[in-house]
Amino acid sequence: MSKGKNRGGNRHIRKPQLAQMVIDYFTRHTGEVIDVRNLFRTLGLNTHPGKLMCMDVLDDLVEQDFLIEREPLRYERTGLPTERERRQKEAEERRKLLMEKTYVGRINVRKDFAFLLTENREVGDLFIPKNQLKGAQTGDKVTARIVDWPEGSKNPVGRVTEVLGRSGENEVEMHAILAEFGLPYTYPKNVEEAANQISDKITPADIAEREDFRDVLTFTIDPRDAKDFDDALSFREIKSGKSSNSKLFEIGVHIADVSHYVTEGSIIDKEAIRRGTSVYLVDRTVPMLPERLCNYICSLRPDEDKLTYSVIFEMNEKAEVKRWHLAHTIIRSDRRFAYEEVQALFEARGEASPEDTPTTLPDGEKPWFDTLTEEQKATPLGKLEGALLCLNRLAKLLRERRFLKGAVDFERPEVRFDIDEKGKPLGTYIKVAKDANKLIEEFMLLANRTVAESIGRVPKGKKAKVLPYRIHEQPDQDKLANLSQFVTKFGHKLKYTGTPAEISKNLNKLLHDVHGSKEQNLVEMVALRAMMKARYSIVNVGHYGLAFDYYTHFTSPIRRYPDLMVHRLLSRYAEGGRSANPEKYEALCDLSSENEQTAALAERASIKYKQVEFMADKIGKIFEGIISGVTEFGLYVELNDSHCEGMIPLRDMDDDYYEFDERNYQLWGKRHHRRFTLGDPIRVRVAKANLDKKQLDFALVTEK
């Protein structure tokens, strides 16, 4: 009787269950060689089918590298984890990583405890004991850390690390965005003190070792509200060429010599590495360098002697560079321009590009070129108009040549805000790059490309010295194929094979063809996604988007750390120094790329917050818009007047049962057959403005 019972004792065991029993057994006996007969006996496998199943399990585990067969029928665990162990370890590591992060949210205090309401889906809301609130009250915005995450618990336990202030206040919300992305909003006291110790005096010795451009016509062109002037241009006609009709110009691209003041390895330098870049939120700049340096000592302010690192070009009327050299210089800017002031000159003299919309100067401001006195016209100020017009013509030639070579023309409109002194958004507008912007852009690109080529281009067989390059790899062929297939939905074509220049030409034609169409935003977005992200690396692969074989960042050391690295290395190599440590600089390049991406995310979050804030007092109002995106979750709509974007959730479109047509990017109603297609005009009502989520919800306005 017992014999019969044993014979069928494990006939109901299943293979997954047996596999786990075998894994557990070998895990307990790691380091031991196990005979299968002992294994059968221990696991109670006394039937032939059970033993055969066990042998199958052992074979599987050998294939998975969990076991190794030391000799026939004798096995040992390899030490490699099982799939279950790997998943558990990954989950533990992920949990550990989450516990090291800082979380931002709004506090909700109850009788005996509190919750931090976060928008982080991985951790949800944090349970905060009363004794860990640090004085926070309901409605406060705070930062917090996780201190415990009990197994199986829905909410991790946290503690408040800083009370930022009341939710909804501009200063608090901007600090919250910075904290959300791990970005600093104040400078450590010791760094500020170190900056205050730096002298702004320029000594005779400083001047003696530099080329002196203080008597050469020099100016800056920047946004109206800028304070950190990284770059200046100087201009003079130096001589006529061989023919009487040919002219030669000396154009200096002068960049703030930050490396003169910030020494490598100093406390200021270490903080700059940590930040990597200045961060531009809607209402403020969070600078990479302390204010004394970025806005005062290094900033190329007018009528002040400033130390610069410069690329000096000799260029003819065809914008061909005949000679150039790199030099440490001293300059004295004659005039600080806003972009609008320079653009107004181009428009007044008929030199603006046809596509540029007319520029409006602030109320009461007269064009600078119409206000010069006779006395001023006899000074360098009187030569500014001619210099700017000449530089504009040269910049257009440089730009035209760049696009003929294969540069890709991605110019996406950017939403900007008019804000009051308290940071409240009063209105929105679209930032558009015009000729004045492009003038500066082209000469900065020329300087960046030139210094990169001077280090990177070496004779065959020689190795180039280490330099951080700004690289942009060629787009992935599979993504281009997907883009080509995608645009056929709208009647467009994209040939994605050929040389890089041919592909770029085809991309530019596509972008030109969709300009002004209802599908423009979506096609541009999908095309951008087909592109690789530009980044920093010491391994040069060129810059696809700009069509440059060599490119770096040299022109903005006040606000970008890679530019400061490039300045130091150029100075080192000019003095005959050896090539820098590649591992060190590649690590700094990786960190700079990460910091750049983080800053961009914070900047976008601040724009989204201000859009929602701008619409918060317009709940219930009706607006005209364009469908800017169609998904299975609903419709994205961009309002015509404010350019704010929100969503009509599919769950709220209850007048019909709508299905998502992915092929044609539209929602269509099964009963009434109404269709909503990308680019369609639409009327919406503002339904919700959730500042915590930075989210606008619209409701569809149905026509009666």
Description of each model-found segment:
Residues 2-252, 259-305, 336-337, 341-346, ...:
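Charge-lined substrate channels and their catalytic hotspots, especially those that engage the 3′ end
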Residues 66, 141, 320, 622, ...:
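Residue-level marker of beta-strand positions
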Residues 110, 239-240, 315-320, 419-423:
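Short acidic-glycine loop/turn motifs at beta-strand connectors
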Residues 285-345, 390, 526-528, 541, ...:
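Covalent nucleotidyltransferase
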Residues 339, 358-641, 647-654, 658-665, ...:
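Append "with occasional cross-activation on large, charged helical scaffolds in nucleic-acid assemblies
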Residues 667-704:
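In a subset of proteins, long, contiguous C-terminal domains/tails are tracked
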